[in-house]
Every structure is written in structure tokens, then in C-alpha cells.
From Swiss-Prot:
Primary location recorded for the protein, binned into one broad class: cytoplasm
Protein name: Prefoldin subunit alpha
Keywords attached to this entry: Chaperone, Cytoplasm
Upper classification of the organism: Archaea, Methanobacteriati, Methanobacteriota, Thermococci, Thermococcales
Functional summary from the UniProt entry: Molecular chaperone capable of stabilizing a range of proteins. Seems to fulfill an ATP-independent, HSP70-like function in archaeal de novo protein folding.
Organism: Pyrococcus horikoshii (strain ATCC 700860 / DSM 12428 / JCM 9974 / NBRC 100139 / OT-3)
Subcellular location: Cytoplasm
Cellular compartments per GO CC: cytoplasm; prefoldin complex
GO BP: any one term: protein folding
Amino acid sequence: MAQNNKELEKLAYEYQVLQAQAQILAQNLELLNLAKAEVQTVRETLENLKKIEEEKPEILVPIGAGSFLKGVIVDKNNAIVSVGSGYAVERSIDEAISFLEKRLKEYDEAIKKTQGALAELEKRIGEVARKAQEVQQKQSMTSFKVKK
């Protein structure tokens, strides 16, 4: 009986650790999806910019709290894109779009990998829960037999 209690404690601890890991992976997955959506929006904006025939089109520049300033795009043939670690480079619109498409593929791979890891964790969580249930049933059967 004491051995069953120790095993249940061990399983409960493992369950909590796995749940915490799954929660972290789920948060990472959410962040990856948000970042991917942002990159998709930028890519779509650049693709739409290519379709505009005006040389210096007017735009609204967000300044925060739902407020905007009117502005003009001075150079609609080039964009400055972040390349990571706080660095940005100027690229032609087509090069910027190509760069963003590569980044989207990287996000897709990271999302797929994270989803796989999360599925494995959830599978392991289910196994631990089933094992704990078996131990509890065994324990209750043993205590039932003893009480007879």
C-alpha cells in the first residue's frame, strides 16, 4: 500500500511537470502563430504596394493608441526589413517579399515541430494519467479485499 502511495506521488509529480512543459509549448506555439501572421501581413502589404500606380502614394502612419498621421511613401520601390538581432537592411520590394516568404517557411517548420512536440507531450500526459488511475484502482481493490 505504501509502495502504491509512493508510485502515485511520483506519477502526480511527473504529470505536473509534463503539464507545465505542455503549457510552455502551447504558449510558444501561440507566439509563433502571431509572429507568422505579422510577417504575412507585411508581405501582403508589400505585394499590394507593387500594384499602386501613384509614384508617391499617401498612407496612414500608426502612432499608437489607435491614432494615425497622414504620410507619403517617398520610395515605393524599396523596403527596410528586419534581419534579426535588431538589424535591418534595405531591399527591393521583390527581394523583401522573397525574404519574408523564406521567413514564413521557417515559421511553418517551427510551428510544425512545436505541434509535434506538444502532441508527444499530450500523449505522455495521457499515459501518466492512465497509469495513475490503474494504481488507484489497484489500491482501492486491495483495500476492499482487506476490509472483508
